[in-house]
């Protein structure tokens, strides 16, 4: 049975070329010490909404589960009060 020895050089090169390899994510709300996410803070909420109007998942943004639930509720409240659009078809 033959074993293939892998070089560290090839491993590093593969990680740089891999499109799924990203830098370590962190929770912006934990770093800032936020206790409650406000639905009136539209600039922050827009950072967590994609181009098509969908809420970006926590696995992509790095947001903790506690803050992701608050963020979800805040975005839905802002949409209900017409502060944010539901879809990307409602551009200003």
Curated annotation (Swiss-Prot):
Protein name, as recorded: Small ribosomal subunit protein bS18
SUPFAM superfamilies on file: Ribosomal protein S18 (SSF46911)
PROSITE patterns in UniProt: RIBOSOMAL_S18 (PS00057)
Family as reported in the entry's similarity comment: Belongs to the bacterial ribosomal protein bS18 family.
GO cellular component: cytosolic small ribosomal subunit
Complexes and interactors: Part of the 30S ribosomal subunit. Forms a tight heterodimer with protein bS6.
InterPro entries per record: Ribosomal_bS18 (IPR001648), Ribosomal_bS18_CS (IPR018275), Ribosomal_bS18_sf (IPR036870)
Stated role: Binds as a heterodimer with protein bS6 to the central domain of the 16S rRNA, where it helps stabilize the platform of the 30S subunit.
Keyword Ribosomal protein in record: yes
GO molecular function: small ribosomal subunit rRNA binding; structural constituent of ribosome
